[in-house]
């Protein structure tokens, strides 16, 4: 979470970032704490590559008023707030066209970078970080025919908070990279699209995504 927060803080300054993994998987943080000095040597020798990672921007609307807006490197999650056994309804649109509606605990809209995070744990696909697409993954949907859907990066996704099965006012929130949260209520909608800014990530080991994926998965 530290690297995600830092990415949102520095993205407008176009400062390349280098992550040091002190946790578990760490797909973004390719350097572990035992390799810090080796990493510094490579930096000083200009032995690195810079990889661009797309971000999402989300705008929450209540009627014709904006109630919140932010960017995310990993994902934007729209989820319920309240009793743990209550699901809420979601109405989903793509480029102003109706897609589907279902009851669930939430919905994840993830970038290729975020596809190895929360979306993956909810059954979403792993997407190569240089792929030009986003993925929508439901969280515990109450239907058998709802699965992750991949969209081109330029598609605009709108998620509207519905009434759910109880047909009462529901409360939810939109979370940006698990950090900034914007409250939502029935009828509110969030419009999500590719951000005009991107994050620059330093790569030192020159490994392909497939090689990194194999290493991370074999160690966990």
What do the predicted segments below correspond to?
Residues 3-4, 144:
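Short, well-ordered alpha-helical microsegments
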Residues 13-31:
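Short, acidic/small-residue loops that bind anionic groups at enzyme active sites
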Residues 97-104, 109-145:
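Gly/Ser/Thr-rich active-site loops/lids in small-molecule metabolic enzymes
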């Amino acid at each position: 979470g530290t690297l995600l927060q830092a990415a949102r803080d520095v993205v407008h300054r176009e400062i390349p970032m280098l992550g040091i993994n002190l946790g578990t998987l760490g797909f973004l943080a390719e350097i572990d704490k035992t390799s810090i000095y080796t990493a510094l040597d490579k930096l000083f020798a200009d032995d690195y590559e810079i990889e661009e990672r797309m971000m999402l921007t989300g705008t929450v609307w209540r009627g014709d008023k904006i109630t919140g807006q932010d960017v995310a490197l990993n994902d934007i999650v729209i989820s319920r707030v309240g009793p743990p056994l209550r699901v809420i309804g979601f109405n989903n649109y793509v480029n102003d066209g109706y897609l589907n509606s279902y009851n669930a605990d939430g919905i994840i809209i993830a970038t290729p970078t975020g596809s190895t995070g929360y979306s993956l744990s909810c059954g979403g696909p792993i997407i190569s970080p240089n792929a030009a697409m986003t993925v929508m993954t439901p969280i515990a949907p109450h239907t058998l025919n709802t699965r992750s859907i991949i969209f081109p990066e330029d598609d605009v996704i709108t998620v509207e908070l519905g009434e759910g099965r109880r047909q009462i006012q529901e409360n939810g929130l939109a979370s940006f990279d698990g950090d900034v949260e914007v409250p939502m209520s029935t009828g509110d909608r969030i419009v999500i699209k590719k951000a005009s800014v991107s994050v620059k990530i330093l790569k030192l080991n020159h490994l392909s995504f497939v090689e990194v994926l194999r290493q991370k998965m074999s160690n966990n």
